[in-house]
Amino acid sequence: MILSVCKRGDKIILPRNVHKSAINALVLCGAIPVYVNPEVNPKLGISLGMEVPCVEQAIKENPDAVAVLVNNPTYYGICSDIRSIVKLAHAHGMKVLADEAHGTHLYFGKNLPVSGMEAGADLAAISMHKSGGSLTQSSILLVNKGVNADYVRQIINLTQTTSASYLLLS
């Protein structure tokens, strides 16, 4: 996702507790991270989601950022107010990327927190193998209107194998 929207020198706003694949993408494309430090629940000792005022402050201090990445939910199941973050980012011309590695289930129930795509995110990465009952390594990349799907395909072709597993594709 990051390689699809960021180029060398572009800024992207993201939580400090992103997956290492996001950091690796920053290294590959040369984008500059603008970190939002999520609060930690003192009782449980776990990171919470990104607070909207913190994202707003990061946008105010970095109006040239091109995107905001949100963990939805976090590894611990905490969801940020992704609707508000999408609205805020889009109002400033920024794309929203939803890392939904642990959010497969959000697409399958009305009484669950809102999914990234339902909230209007531009891209969402879903790891079907983590909470969707699929084989390890299987995932889905969802692309919304306003994102050049052909360019996303080009980026995917640069970074994934030419010998895909037919078990995972099925």
What function would you assign to each model-found segment?
Residues 1-170:
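Conserved PLP-enzyme active-site core in the AAT-like
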